[in-house]
Amino acid sequence: MAILGLGTDIVEIARIEAVIARSGDRLARRVLSDHEWSIWEQHQQPVRFLAKRFAVKEAAAKALGTGIRNGLAFNQFEVYNDELGKPKLRLWGEANLLAERMGVSAIHVTLADERHYACATVIVES
């Protein structure tokens, strides 16, 4: 296995909160998959949940070498947790096709949040 890409992103939680205050759930609708949306709607800390998902998806797009552009969209990345709570990532659509073309066989995700920030790192391996 070889590392094909590495991406990191940090999000100021207050900025996400300000966007939600200004435009309602528009950002969440753009960023979250249907499954993530159903969790977000009932989450005790929806702003923090959205900030962490945003950070993971930005980091994943960077790890794939493109960022969110060229046909990639936030909702093509889905963050979920395994049975132990470890964050994992599913890819859909163009993001999945790009990963297949790159020869990605494993995706590693780590995320953290503190009072003011959410941070994520994603490594893609062959």
UniProtKB/Swiss-Prot annotation:
Q: Which Gene3D superfamilies match?
A: 4'-phosphopantetheinyl transferase domain
Enzyme superclass (EC) = transferase
Pfam families documented for this protein: ACPS
Where is this chain's protein located in or outside the cell?
Answer: Cytoplasm
> Which parts of the sequence bind Mg(2+)?
9, 58
Cofactor(s) recorded for this entry are: Mg(2+)
Output the GO biological process annotations, alphabetical, semicolon-separated: fatty acid biosynthetic process
List keywords of the entry alphabetically.
Answer: Cytoplasm, Fatty acid biosynthesis, Fatty acid metabolism, Lipid biosynthesis, Lipid metabolism, Magnesium, Metal-binding, Transferase
Task: Give the chief site where it resides.
Answer: cytoplasm
Q: Could you tell me what reaction this enzyme catalyses?
A: apo-[ACP] + CoA = holo-[ACP] + adenosine 3',5'-bisphosphate + H(+)
Keyword Metal-binding part of the UniProt annotation: yes
Q: What does this protein do?
A: Transfers the 4'-phosphopantetheine moiety from coenzyme A to a Ser of acyl-carrier-protein.
Q: Which family does it belong to?
A: Belongs to the P-Pant transferase superfamily. AcpS family.
Q: Under what name is this protein listed?
A: Holo-[acyl-carrier-protein] synthase
